[in-house]
Amino acid sequence: MARSLVIVESPAKAKTINKYLGRNYTVKASYGHVMDLPKKTIGILLPGEQNGKKKSKRKTKGKGKAVVEKKPVKQVPVTAENIFEPTYEVIPTKLKVIGDLQKAASTAEAIYLAGDPDREGEAICYHLEEILSNPRKYTKVVAEKTAEIAAEADAESEKNGKDGDKPTASAKTTKKAVVQTLARTTAPKIYRVMFNEITQKAIKAAFEHPTQVNVNLVDAQQARRVLDRLVGYKVSPILWDKVRRGLSAGRVQTVALRLIVEREKEVRA
């Protein structure tokens, strides 16, 4: 009999929850967010900003050495409808975690997303649902990301005079997960469960009344993330230029700093 897959944020919770649910459930952790805005670009549709992604191809050249070839893709036109739209991508350090979850999902009877009951937890569940409900698309994404990282690692090894022919351990692990996951082309049913305490009673009640991901909470998290990125990316460089390098601006910290300065001025007046 196939087991149901339960995904929580923290591995510390998994063992206790698994004990309460019993042998018909497998509990795994996402270790927090699995998708985020890109690090190398702003990741938000804005006029004048690069929003196309560069695709990396791992090619073999010469004596079997791997090289990385990057090709720019067409820019997405910014309109009144899509301005400020974020572009999320799989977090590179979560490739193995995602591969493991895809493998578990490929044989699961159902999937229960048990992220924390807040907007961050809802966003994590939303991205997990996106990945696990599109097995063919995201096994390819994971494979391409892993190949890109492996190619960059091989290129770095070659640059440093090391052997760059051997595939990395992460590439081997993910390749195996991809092969196993592609055996299943359709995802099982996916549910959202929430509980405020890790007790048998609370968990049982949550699983008796599963729901769906709350898109309004996801939108709230994305709005916060976009504001954080806009302030950080746009204001921090101005501080570096006008005040001092190394200073940072933030959606909360900059406003808090202004309140402190204004209060200090009142005290000194």
Positions of the model-derived regions?
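Intrinsically disordered, low-complexity regulatory segments
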Residues: 2-150, 159-222
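C-terminal or mid-to-C-terminal helical accessory/interaction module adjacent to the motor/catalytic core
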Residues: 93, 106, 197-269
